[in-house]
Amino acid sequence: MRKRIAALVSICLLMVCLTSFASARASEYFSYTAVYATALDDGEILIEYDIDPTHTMLECGAKMIYIYEGYNNKNFKVVDSFHMDDYPDMIQHDTIIGDGEVTYPGTPGKDYYALVGVYAKDQYGSETIYFPTNVVTAHN
C-alpha cells in the first residue's frame, strides 16, 4: 500500500513539475509584456505599453488599443480606439523591444482603462495578445 501511495505522489509531483515547465513561456513571441494607465492633469489619460519579444521581430508594438470609460468603476463602454494602421508610431520595426504610449482626453471624475493588443511579427508568423490596464479616475 505504501508503494502505491509513494508512486501516486511521485506521479502527481512529476505532473506538477511538467505543467509548470510547459507554461513558463506560453508564447513564442513575448518574453515580457506590461500595459499601464495613468491619470494626468486636465483629465488626460496616458496608456503605455512595454513589450520584450523573445527575439528580433520584423514588427513589435501595439496593434490595437481600446479605451473604456465608466463611472464609479461600473458600466464601462468603448469610447475610442487606436489602430496601428492609423497610428504607425505604435509599431517598431526590426527591433528587440516594443514600447509606446497614447493619450486620451478624459473627463474628470470618470473612470478609464484600456484593452491593449500587444503584437509581434517575425518571418514565420505573428501573435496578438490582449491585456487590460489598471482602472484610473481622470482628474483636473
Where are these regions (language model features)?
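Short, surface-exposed binding/anchoring microloops in extracellular/periplasmic proteins
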Residues: 30-69
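Beta-strand-rich extracellular modules
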Residues: 117-121
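Sec-dependent signal peptide cleavage junction
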Residues: 18-29
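Short beta-strand elements
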Residues: 122-140
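Bacterial N-terminal signal peptides
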Residues: 9-17
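Short, solvent-exposed, Trp/other aromatic-anchored flexible loops in extracytoplasmic proteins
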Residues: 83-116
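Positively charged n-region of N-terminal signal peptides that target proteins for export
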Residues: 1-4
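Solvent-exposed serine/threonine-rich low-complexity stretches and specific carbohydrate-binding patches
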Residues: 64-65, 75-93, 132-135
